[in-house]
């Protein structure tokens, strides 16, 4: 079985809690939540995550801004938790025509693994998360 740390970054409390509970139900070792990009970056520099589920549209700092900040942090040798960045699964309610998948993926091609559109298929998302967890 694969296990690891997962960070769910979603500003909607209900969606964030639902995702956390669903992933915990899949027996993942640790699932944390963050309400916005600022909180997420703080957590990422203090703990190593295998997977980050990242909403695009959030207050304070968007998911795109989080990706840009992660790229900058990865080049900082003093931040050890980012030397092996998490696999990022982006979630968004934006229409594909307004925010194409490749536009998101190009921002951080080493990290963004997949883009999911809301409403989410939770089982599909959980299965995808599991593929990026260490064995």
Model-found features: residue ranges?
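Hydrophobic/aromatic residues positioned on beta-strands within the core alpha/beta folds
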Residues: 91-93
């Amino acid at each position: 079985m694969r296990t690891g740390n997962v960070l769910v970054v979603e500003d909607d409390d209900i969606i964030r809690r639902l995702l956390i509970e669903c992933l915990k139900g899949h027996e993942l070792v640790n699932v944390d939540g963050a309400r916005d990009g600022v909180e997420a970056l703080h957590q990422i520099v203090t703990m190593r995550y295998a997977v980050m589920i990242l909403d695009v549209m959030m207050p304070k700092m968007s998911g795109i801004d989080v990706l840009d900040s992660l790229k900058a942090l990865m080049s900082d040798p003093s931040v050890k938790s980012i030397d092996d960045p998490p696999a990022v699964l982006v979630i968004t309610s934006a229409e594909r025509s307004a925010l194409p998948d490749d536009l998101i993926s190009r921002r951080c091609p080493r990290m963004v693994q997949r883009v999911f559109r809301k409403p989410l298929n939770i089982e599909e998302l959980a299965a995808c998360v599991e593929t990026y967890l260490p064995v």
